């Protein structure tokens, strides 16, 4: 058990004449074991149970699952600094790098599967080291492998790392996918940036073995590996983006219509129309969730906070928010277009108020251009509020609603739900609107292309400047 290991290490220090670096390494290991023992004891006391401690390699897993990222980072940096300062023989380092089981335990489990990700925060954001340390440690291990010519070992190591990250991100669903998805998107891009540096060096003839410490290896194998790993990391970054964005869009798709089209927050403009969805409501019963604009804004806020806290590039942040806003705009516009009873000026007032809340969110987050994704819906609400009594009124509608096609305008006007105190739209007006529709005009479509749950094309940002790793 742990106590026996501590006693054994103490006896080793007393009984051997070792270099000071080795003694310090043993003392560090004792301190780590004591910390694990105290953690396990405290955990057992809280749970009121006694958990048997297994072989030593299992301790890394339990520690990683309980310790926050900052603590893991501090421990690993201490160990790395200590090893860099110590005169460790290359053979010893190579033995560590060739220990596949221990590497898998420390990296695949400790750094990926059981890592406690730092929580996003705009007021007290985690530092870059706290966020990106998994990628830095993975890059450091890779760099050491290449330094000593362990090309095939690094290929196996990186393949397992990429597979584990992808599977880990895919294990999360709904709202739970946002934090790990964005966290690992940023870390994978950091690893990719490290590989891009290695590729640049490789093209200049710089690579493993220049200092004579590397084992024999084929330079062609190294070139092939760097090329393949770069391509695979590129694909992994897209897959991560695709996975968590798909989960976010699925969740958002459930919210859009109830929150943006159906909810009525403005007093004095409440309507009792059913919108032709009475049958659907009866079939769904009371189990259908009710969403409000607060739910949509909460999803946008969480996504924004993660993108900023985990140091994702501004170009990616803009891409993410734009894609989510586009889904909101397209889904709500198409829904409104097909609802006869919702095409009233009171409903238009309610929807316009909800749009205003999204526009204010975009402005407060320095993305005023994001509201362009809502322009079709906004112009539809304006159309429903404008007069439709004379031909000059119709001309004004076509000027104001310049983004809408003639077919969309005809649909909204023909569906317009006249209030009791309003005059019906005259047949002459309806005929004039219909005459503007040109048959077989390919540019004149009714519905906007629907936004599916799948993420759109991902534009890979430029490689970052990676510092602190010797390449």
Regions found by a protein language model. Give the residues of each.
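Short intrinsically disordered, low-complexity coil segments enriched in acidic
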Residues: 1-7, 183-186
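Eukaryotic terminal intrinsically disordered regions
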Residues: 3-101, 107, 339, 346-471
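Extended cytosolic scaffolds built from alpha-helical repeats
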Residues: 52-352
């Amino acid at each position: 058990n742990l106590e026996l290991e501590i006693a054994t290490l103490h006896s080793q220090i007393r009984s051997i004449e070792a270099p000071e670096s080795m003694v310090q390494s043993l003392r560090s290991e004792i301190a780590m074991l004591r910390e694990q023992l105290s953690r396990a004891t405290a955990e057992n006391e809280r749970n009121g149970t006694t958990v048997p401690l297994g072989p030593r390699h299992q301790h890394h897993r339990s520690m990683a699952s309980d310790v926050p990222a900052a603590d893991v980072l501090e421990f690993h940096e201490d160990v790395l600094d200590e090893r860099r300062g110590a005169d460790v023989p290359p053979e010893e380092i190579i033995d560590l790098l060739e220990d596949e089981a221990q590497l898998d335990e420390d990296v695949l489990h400790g750094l990926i599967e059981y890592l406690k990700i730092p929580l996003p925060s705009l007021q007290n954001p985690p530092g870059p080291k706290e966020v990106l340390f998994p990628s830095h440690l993975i890059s450091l291990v890779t760099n050491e492998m290449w330094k000593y010519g362990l090309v095939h070992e690094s290929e196996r190591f990186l393949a397992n790392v990429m597979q584990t990250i992808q599977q880990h991100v895919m294990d999360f669903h709904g709202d739970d996918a946002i934090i790990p998805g964005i966290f690992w998107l940023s870390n994978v891009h950091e690893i990719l940036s490290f590989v891009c540096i290695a590729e640049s060096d490789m093209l200049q003839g710089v690579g493993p073995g220049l200092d004579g410490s590397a084992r024999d290896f084929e330079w062609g194998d190294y070139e092939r590996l760097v090329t393949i790993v770069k391509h695979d990391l590129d694909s992994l970054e897209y897959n991560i983006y695709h996975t968590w964005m798909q989960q976010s869009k699925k969740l958002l798709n459930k919210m859009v219509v109830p929150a943006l089209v159906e909810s009525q927050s403005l007093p004095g403009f409440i309507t009792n129309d059913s919108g032709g969805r009475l049958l659907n409501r009866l079939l769904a019963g009371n189990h259908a969730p009710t969403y409000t604009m607060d739910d949509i804004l909460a999803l946008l806020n969480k996504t924004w906070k993660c993108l900023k806290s985990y140091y994702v590039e501004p170009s990616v942040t803009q891409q993410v928010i734009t894609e989510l806003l586009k889904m909101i705009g397209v889904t709500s516009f198409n829904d409104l277009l097909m609802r006869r009873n919702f095409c009233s000026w009171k409903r238009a007032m309610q929807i316009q108020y909800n749009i205003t809340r999204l526009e204010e969110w975009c402005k407060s987050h320095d993305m005023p251009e994001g509201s362009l994704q809502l322009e079709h819906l906004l112009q539809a609400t304006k159309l429903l509020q404008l007069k439709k009594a004379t031909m000059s009124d119709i001309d004004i509608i076509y000027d104001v609603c310049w983004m809408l096609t003639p077919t969309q305008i005809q649909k909204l006007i023909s569906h317009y739900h006249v209030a009791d105190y309003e005059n019906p739209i005259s047949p002459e007006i309806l005929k004039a609107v219909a005459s503007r529709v040109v048959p077989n005009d390919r540019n004149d479509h009714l519905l906007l292309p629907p936004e599916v749950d799948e993420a759109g094309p991902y534009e890979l940002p430029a490689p970052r400047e990676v510092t602190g790793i010797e390449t």
